Amino acid sequence: MASFLQAQLKDVETLIAQEKEDKAQEALNFTQGGLKNFANEIEKVDGGFYGLVGILFRRAYHVPDDIKKLREALFQEAERLQKLLAKNSEKNRNKLDRNVAKAAKALQTSELAILPTETVYGLFANALDEKAVKKLYAVKGRPTEKALNMNVASYADILKYSKHQPVYLEKLVGAFLPGPLTIILEASNAVPEWIHIGKTTVGFRMPSIKITQKVIEKVGVLVGPSANLTGDPSPQFFADLSPQILENAQVAIQDDSIYGLDTTIIDLTGKTPRLLRQGAITREQLLREVPELADIQ
């Protein structure tokens, strides 16, 4: 038991070093629970620790004779890691805030920004800024007749830029967004023509990567197709970004916590919902969370 807890604490320290604060805190909470249980077991046998019960206990848990010192050392190490985690979290929050401000400033001045999503890196522009969107098309070499999805911060944004939504839309959004799902709906009059390119529909994305979420919240609705030249592979890793794309983006934020699976695309504009692409979210998951999609094609 003691060796297991020691290994767990080492794992926590590794996660902190990797700046994976959420996972580190989760692992530390689990380990602290184990430490409490360990301490309770020690208290139960404390009176007879050096007798037969104590011998059996030490053998069962594979711990040395000086168990109280070991227990104290484990608790001290857990406390040290909690303080280290808090310090690192504050440092990374400051770094996140700086990067959000830098990306937001670029996007608010008609510039482009490379930001991570769950799937690949995206090349982002302010969706309501025609100059910026035209620049994005030019940099990517994207056909001008190819419409763009809107990256939004909230369900309210989806309602603002769409119309004739199905009654189960809020349930669908609540279950899967933020996340790797694109929802296609009828476009409202609030969607600029340079986004829908004459189409009556528009796709909505809500990325789950923290920095990209915060940038969208700060700037407003963004467009963000994959950060590659048209025809090239989509960049799953920062190293995959082409020099031409990097040169034309004022800001590029690295975060390789991307898992590389395609987004799932669902079209809700017809009488029957259509699954246009099954990606990270499967048909089975959609049906389990939203039974109203039972007739999906």
How would you name each of these model-derived features?
Residues E13-A73, E77-N88:
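Long, low-complexity or tandemly repetitive, helically biased scaffold regions used
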Residues Q6, R71, V173-G174:
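Short, well-structured alpha-helical segments
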Residues E90-Q297:
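Active-site-adjacent structural elements in enzyme catalytic cores
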Residues M1-E13, A78:
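Short terminal alpha-helical segments
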Residues A2, L52-V53, D65, L74, ...:
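A general, composition-driven signal for non-globular sequence regions
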